[in-house]
Amino acid sequence: MSLTDTIRNTFVPIHREGYPFIAGFFVVSLILGWLWDPLFWIGMVLTVWCIYFYRDPERVTPMDDDLVISPADGKVSFVGPAVPPAELDLGAEPRMRVSVFMNVFSVHINRSPVRGKIEKVVHRPGKFLNAELDKASTENERNSVLIESPHGKIGVVQIAGLVARRIVCWSNEDDDLSVGERFGLIRFGSRVDVYLPADATVRVAVGQTAVAGETVLADYGSVRGEPVVRIG
């Protein structure tokens, strides 16, 4: 391992979305420490946790249009047919859905599962049920992204959870996304659903650990073994 790789693996970048929160925790720690010294260290523990939460590691993403890559870090919590949210305009027929649940210790940056153009971004208010529940797909607050990929339309839905109360999506309609490119995040535990085209074959199982930008969720049966690249 080179010195550059060692430094990269040791000092994981922090996403800019976390800067205000990290600064806020640090300032509060100073104020609490001024009141009582032990409170400073409690505040610093929370500050370090906030830094950890907003970590944004680089990922090595397979550059192959025949693959669908995980958009989130976490555990595969559901694999099976499900009707997509109406706002995606994918029809009323069930599609194969893969859900990845993120807990509070997961990296919360969301990445595009495919290369393509964003056709639609729709935010829907809703409840904040446990994101592991299946009904969270329809009842919880969510942000639905429709991507036109080389193999057809794919729906990616960011779902708020019991603790997560803030969905962030900085990509817009007509934006072009590369596979593995960051498009948003969800704070403090949540879920991402991927609705696949009919000809996609799922390659993961419930309970499996998924890594955003790296784990292959599905393929189209003609994987060519293209090279991988690091998505910073």
Swiss-Prot record:
EC class of the enzyme, as a word: lyase
Pathway: Phospholipid metabolism; phosphatidylethanolamine biosynthesis; phosphatidylethanolamine from CDP-diacylglycerol: step 2/2
Entry's EC annotation: 4.1.1.65
Gene Ontology terms, MF aspect: phosphatidylserine decarboxylase activity
InterPro entries for the chain: PS_Dcarbxylase, PSD-A
Compartmental location: Cell membrane
Subunit structure: Heterodimer of a large membrane-associated beta subunit and a small pyruvoyl-containing alpha subunit.
Biological process, per Gene Ontology: phosphatidylethanolamine biosynthetic process
Organism lineage string: Bacteria, Pseudomonadati, Pseudomonadota, Alphaproteobacteria, Hyphomicrobiales
Free-text comment on the cofactor: Binds 1 pyruvoyl group covalently per subunit.
Membrane topology, as annotated: Peripheral membrane protein
Source organism, top-level taxon: Bacteria
Major localization class: membrane
Family: Belongs to the phosphatidylserine decarboxylase family. PSD-A subfamily.
PTM: Is synthesized initially as an inactive proenzyme. Formation of the active enzyme involves a self-maturation process in which the active site pyruvoyl group is generated from an internal serine residue via an autocatalytic post-translational modification. Two non-identical subunits are generated from the proenzyme in this reaction, and the pyruvate is formed at the N-terminus of the alpha chain, which is derived from the carboxyl end of the proenzyme.
Described function: Catalyzes the formation of phosphatidylethanolamine (PtdEtn) from phosphatidylserine (PtdSer).
Organism: Brucella anthropi (strain ATCC 49188 / DSM 6882 / CCUG 24695 / JCM 21032 / LMG 3331 / NBRC 15819 / NCTC 12168 / Alc 37)
Signal peptide: none
Full protein name: Phosphatidylserine decarboxylase proenzyme
Keywords attached to this entry: Cell membrane, Decarboxylase, Lipid biosynthesis, Lipid metabolism, Lyase, Membrane, Phospholipid biosynthesis, Phospholipid metabolism, Pyruvate, Zymogen
Residues bearing PTM Pyruvic acid (Ser): S190
Gene from which the chain derives: psd
Cited Pfam families: PS_Dcarbxylase
One GO cellular component term noted in the UniProt record for this chain: plasma membrane
Active site: S190 (schiff-base intermediate with substrate)
